[in-house]
C-alpha cells in the first residue's frame, strides 16, 4: 500500500510521556508497527511532550523501555534519529510558532480575545436556543478599533483556526465515508494566550513535516479529523504539507461494566502485565484481537504471522471488550510455545529474591531444570511459577489450610500410611512406578487414583492443585517426600 500520491507508507506512534504506559496505547503502537512492517514502510516514533505539568522524564524513560520490552523497533525517533529530527515536540517550539504566524498572515487563523466567561455565557445561550454550542466566530472579523480596545483592556488573545463554511467528507480506513457539517465543526484554538501551541496545531504540523501518509489512532480522536483535514489544506497552500494523510480510527477498548478502558484503570497498566509475567508475544497476540483477527478459527499466532496478514481495512469499528481471562489463556498458550530453555530463563526473575520465598542457597538448579518442562504445561503467567515450585526449595511445604481440610478427611491417615509403604518400596527414578504405588494404596482402601493422590499431594506440596504429582515426587526425591508424609501423619495424629 502507498499513500494517495503513491509515496511509501509512513506512519507514526506519538504518545505523551504521562504516567505508566497502558494497553490501549500498546494496541495503537502495535497496529501502527504492524502496518508499517507489512508494507515495508517507515514507523516514526514521536514524543508529544508539550504538557509541562504532566510530562516527566521518568515517564519518557518508561515509554522507551516498554517499546523495547514489547519488541517494537522504529525507523525514526528517539535514540535512532532521522531526517525530521528532533522527535520530541518540546524541542520543536520554533517550528510551531513559525507555522502559526504563517497561518495568521494568510488569514487561515485569527486572534480571539473572548474571555472564558464570555464564551460560557454565549455557549449557554446557544444551548438554550437549541443551536450548536461551539465557538460562534465572535472574533472572526474584528476591526482594528476592536482589536485596539481589547488590547487596551489587557486581554491576551488565543489563536483560532478559521474553519471553512463547508462540509468535510473523508473515507476512514476503518469506518468508511464520514461527513461533518460545518455547524458541527467550529473554529478552534491552536495557540494559547501565553503563546504555547496546542495539540490541535502541533500534531498535524508534525505529521505534515514528517510526511506521514497514514494516521492510525484511537476512536476518541475521530471528531478532531475534520479540523485537521481543514488545517492540512491550509498547510498545503502554505507549502508546509504535501498531502493529506489517510485516517483510520481504531475501536474503543472496553473494560469492566462495558465502560471505555481508561489509562487510570488498574487493569490497563502495562507494568501490571509485565510484573505478572505476561510474555510480550502473548500480550501482543491478545491485543491484536481487540478489533482485528488473523482468521475466524485461529486466535494464537506469532507476531510475524500478524505482520504478514495485517490489513487495516480488516479492523472492525465496533468497540472491543478487554477479557482478562482470555488474555491469560492466550498468554499461557504462548508460554507453551517457548523452547524449554527459553522458558527456564524467562522465569528467573520469579525464582530469586525478593520474589521467591526460599533462601537463595536453597535453590537447586538441577531440580529447577528437571521440573521446568512440567511447569511449562500449567502456567498462564510466569509469576505463577513461584507457588508452583516452592515445595522443591522450601524446607517444609507451605500448607494451604483449605487444601488440607479438603484432602485430609477421615481415613486419610490410613491411606497415607499405606501410600508411604508402597512408595518406600517403589522405583524413584520412574514417575510411572510412583503412580502405580499410589494407585495400589488407593485400591487397598477402595479409592480411585484421584482420591488416593490428593492427601499425598497436600502432604508433599501443601496444595491440592499443582504440577504433575509423580514427576514432582521424582524431582523432590524419596527422602524429602517420605519425610513430609511422616510429618503429615504426625499432624493428623496430633
Curated annotation (Swiss-Prot):
GO biological process entries: glutamyl-tRNA aminoacylation
Chain positions recorded as Zn(2+) binding sites: 112, 114, 139, 141
Keywords: Aminoacyl-tRNA synthetase, ATP-binding, Cytoplasm, Ligase, Metal-binding, Nucleotide-binding, Protein biosynthesis, Zinc
A Pfam match: Anticodon_2
Listed EC numbers: 6.1.1.17
Keyword Ion transport belongs to the record: no
Main location: cytoplasm
Motif placement: 'HIGH' region: 15-25
Entry's Gene Ontology cellular component terms: cytosol
Subcellular location: Cytoplasm
Domain of life where this protein originates: Bacteria
Gene Ontology molecular-function annotations: ATP binding; glutamate-tRNA ligase activity; tRNA binding; zinc ion binding
Cofactor stoichiometry and binding remark: Binds 1 zinc ion per subunit.
Group of enzyme by EC: ligase
Names of required cofactors: Zn(2+)
Catalytic reactions on record: tRNA(Glu) + L-glutamate + ATP = L-glutamyl-tRNA(Glu) + AMP + diphosphate
Residue positions of motif 'KMSKS' region: 260-264
UniProt record similarity statement: Belongs to the class-I aminoacyl-tRNA synthetase family. Glutamate--tRNA ligase type 1 subfamily.
Function description: Catalyzes the attachment of glutamate to tRNA(Glu) in a two-step reaction: glutamate is first activated by ATP to form Glu-AMP and then transferred to the acceptor end of tRNA(Glu).
Subunit relationships: Monomer.
Name of this chain's protein: Glutamate--tRNA ligase
Record gene name: gltX
Amino acid at each position: 500500500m502507498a499513500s494517495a500520491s503513491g509515496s511509501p507508507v509512513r506512519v507514526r506512534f506519538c504518545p505523551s510521556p504521562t504516567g505508566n504506559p497502558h494497553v490501549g496505547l500498546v494496541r495503537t503502537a502495535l497496529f501502527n508497527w504492524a502496518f508499517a512492517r507489512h508494507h515495508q514502510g517507515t514507523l516514526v516514533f514521536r514524543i508529544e511532550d508539550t504538557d509541562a505539568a504532566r510530562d516527566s522524564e521518568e515517564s519518557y524513560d518508561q515509554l522507551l523501555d516498554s517499546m523495547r520490552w514489547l519488541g517494537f523497533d522504529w525507523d525514526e525517533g528517539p535514540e535512532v534519529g532521522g531526517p525530521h529530527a528532533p522527535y520530541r515536540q518540546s524541542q520543536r517550539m520554533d517550528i510551531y510558532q513559525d507555522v502559526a504566524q504563517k497561518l495568521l498572515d494568510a488569514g487561515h487563523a485569527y486572534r480571539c480575545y473572548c474571555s472564558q466567561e464570555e464564551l460560557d455565557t454565549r455557549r449557554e445561550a446557544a444551548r438554550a436556543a437549541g443551536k450548536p454550542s461551539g465557538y460562534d466566530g465572535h472574533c472572526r472579523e474584528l476591526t482594528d478599533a476592536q482589536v485596539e480596545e481589547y488590547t487596551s483592556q489587557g486581554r491576551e488573545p488565543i489563536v483560532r483556526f478559521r474553519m471553512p463554511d463547508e462540509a468535510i467528507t473523508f473515507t476512514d480506513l476503518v469506518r468508511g465515508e464520514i461527513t461533518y457539517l460545518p455547524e458541527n465543526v467550529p473554529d478552534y484554538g491552536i495557540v494559547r494566550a501565553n503563546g504555547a501551541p496546542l495539540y490541535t496545531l502541533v500534531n498535524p504540523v508534525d505529521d505534515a513535516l514528517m510526511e506521514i501518509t497514514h494516521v492510525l489512532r484511537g476512536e476518541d480522536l475521530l471528531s478532531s479529523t475534520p479540523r485537521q483535514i481543514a488545517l492540512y489544506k491550509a498547510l498545503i497552500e502554505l507549502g508546509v504539507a504535501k498531502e493529506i494523510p489517510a485516517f483510520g480510527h481504531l475501536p474503543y477498548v472496553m473494560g469492566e461494566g462495558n465502560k471505555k478502558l481508561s489509562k487510570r484503570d488498574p487493569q490497563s497498566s502495562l507494568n501490571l502485565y509485565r510484573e505478572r509475567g505476561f510474555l510480550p508475544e502473548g500480550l501482543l497476540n491478545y491485543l491484536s484481537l481487540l478489533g482485528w483477527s488473523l482468521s475466524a478459527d485461529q486466535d494464537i499466532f506469532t507476531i510475524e504471522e500478524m505482520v504478514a496478514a495485517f490489513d487495516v481495512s480488516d479492523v472492525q469499528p465496533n468497540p472491543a471488550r478487554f477479557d482478562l481471562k482470555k488474555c491469560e489463556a492466550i498468554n499461557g498458550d504462548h508460554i507453551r510455545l517457548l523452547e524449554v530453555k527459553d522458558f527456564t530463563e524467562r522465569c528467573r526473575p520469579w525464582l530469586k529474591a525478593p520474589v521467591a520465598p526460599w533462601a537463595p542457597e536453597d535453590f537447586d538448579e538441577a531440580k529447577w531444570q528437571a521440573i521446568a518442562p512440567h511447569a511449562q504445561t500449567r502456567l498462564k503467567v510466569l509469576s505463577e511459577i513461584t507457588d508452583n515450585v516452592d515445595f522443591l526449595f522450601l524446607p517444609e511445604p507451605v500448607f494451604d489450610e483449605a487444601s488440607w481440610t479438603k484432602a485430609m478427611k477421615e481415613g486419610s491417615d490410613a491411606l497415607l500410611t499405606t501410600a508411604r509403604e508402597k512408595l518406600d518400596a517403589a522405583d524413584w527414578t520412574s514417575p510411572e512406578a510412583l503412580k502405580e504405588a499410589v494407585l495400589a494404596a488407593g485400591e487397598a482402601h477402595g479409592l480411585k487414583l484421584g482420591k488416593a493422590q490428593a492427601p499425598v499431594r497436600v502432604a508433599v506440596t501443601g496444595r491440592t492443585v499443582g504440577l504433575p504429582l509423580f514427576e514432582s515426587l521424582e524431582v523432590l526425591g524419596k527422602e524429602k517426600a517420605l519425610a513430609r508424609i511422616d510429618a503429615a501423619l504426625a499432624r493428623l495424629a496430633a
